[in-house]
Amino acid sequence: MDQSGSNTNMDIEKESTTFDYSKRSQWLRAAVLGANDGLVSTASLMMGVGAVKHDVKAMILSGFAGMVAGACSMAIGEFVSVYSQYDIEVAQMERDSVEIEKEKLPSPMQAAAASALAFSAGAIVPLLAAAFVKEYKMRIISVVVAVTVALMVFGWLGAALGKAPAVRSSARVLFGGWLAMAVTFGLTKLIGLYGL
């Protein structure tokens, strides 16, 4: 009897120490996507403007406009998406004649705020990197270096929180960010040179 009691205690301990990381996936995906999107889209926009205009003010203003527009867009998109999910879950509970537990339902406002905040957190990195560097080439280099470090951190953070392989995650995020910046810079430079 003592042995079965100790086995039960061990099972309870095992259950309490086991954590289902898949439950984190929804908010983790939204946070990483928002921050990564803010980082890459703002940096790419700044690189594109920097390809044709060497003026620091133009680069910073374009990055700031991109940050504000992107944060608003992400917030609205997340609000609409989560509100649709909310409506579906409420309708299903009503069909099943189940008492609606509001605290278990997703919050569209929280999701919108979190998405806008995550986007802004990512977007601020290239803005700060460019803001204090007057010389054109050094400004471009500082944006690329700051974005590279941030992409690696975001990739590692996403992997660590989701208990996934960190190197692969960081490499994937880094390659995607570099590709976006290179394509934007290259195409804008080409259009600027040939006046297309």
UniProtKB/Swiss-Prot annotation:
Annotated coiled-coil segments of the chain? none
Gene Ontology CC terms, in alphabetical order: vacuolar membrane
* Localization per Swiss-Prot or TrEMBL: Vacuole membrane
The protein's superkingdom reads Eukaryota
Q: Which residues lie on this side of the membrane: Cytoplasmic?
A: 1-31, 81-112, 161-172
Record keyword Cytoplasm present: no
Task: Indicate how the chain sits in the lipid bilayer.
Answer: Multi-pass membrane protein
Description of what induces expression: Down-regulated under iron deficiency. Induced by iron supply.
What's this protein's family per the entry?
A: Belongs to the CCC1 family.
Function, as annotated, reads: Vacuolar iron transporter involved in the transfer of iron ions from the cytosol to the vacuole for intracellular iron storage. Involved in regulation of cellular iron homeostasis. Vacuolar iron storage is required for seed embryo and seedling development.
- PANTHER family in alphabetical order: FE(2+)/MN(2+) TRANSPORTER PCL1
Q: What is this protein called?
A: Vacuolar iron transporter homolog 2
